[in-house]
């Protein structure tokens, strides 16, 4: 699974800062989480088929955004089961897309790596360590 976002802020919020509490006020962050991880900026070179997890399509599946997207860490096993079920039931789907929980101004994606053909994602520059980018972002408000 490849996680991403339409913006760097969205990508950070959906990965490195995913488990930061969804509440106002002071927040803590495990500085060890991004160590050893990297991020890349890519261009989508060919159309990808993603399952839209916006509110209207979720209603058709009988689940709400609050039950699937706007969840805390303890619900991750359930969200993983939904992703696995959508993977099985939608053999042409190459991933999932939704409005980010912590940055709802941008779309987040989870791409099924085995369904993304070579050349579909073109790197724009070298990959960088998440640690550097995450530390720059913590100097701003999250």
Q: Which role fits each region the language model picked out?
A:
Residues 21-142:
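Active-site and NAD+-binding cores of ADP-ribose-processing enzymes
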Residues 1-23:
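Extended catalytic/binding region for NAD+/ADP-ribose chemistry, centered on the ART fold
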């Amino acid at each position: 699974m490849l996680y991403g976002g339409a913006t760097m802020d969205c990508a950070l919020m959906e990965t490195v800062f995913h488990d930061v509490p969804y509440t106002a006020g002071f927040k803590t962050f495990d500085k060890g989480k991004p160590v050893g991880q990297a991020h890349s900026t890519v261009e989508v070179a060919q159309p990808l088929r993603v399952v839209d997890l916006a509110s209207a399509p979720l209603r058709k599946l009988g689940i709400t955004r609050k039950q699937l997207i706007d969840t805390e860490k303890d619900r991750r096993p359930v969200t993983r089961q939904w992703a696995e079920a959508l993977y099985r039931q939608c053999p042409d789907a190459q991933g999932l897309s939704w409005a980010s929980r912590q940055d709802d101004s941008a779309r987040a994606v989870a791409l099924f790596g085995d369904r993304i053909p070579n050349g579909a994602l073109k790197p724009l520059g070298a990959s960088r360590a998440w640690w550097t980018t995450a530390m720059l972002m913590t100097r701003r408000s999250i």
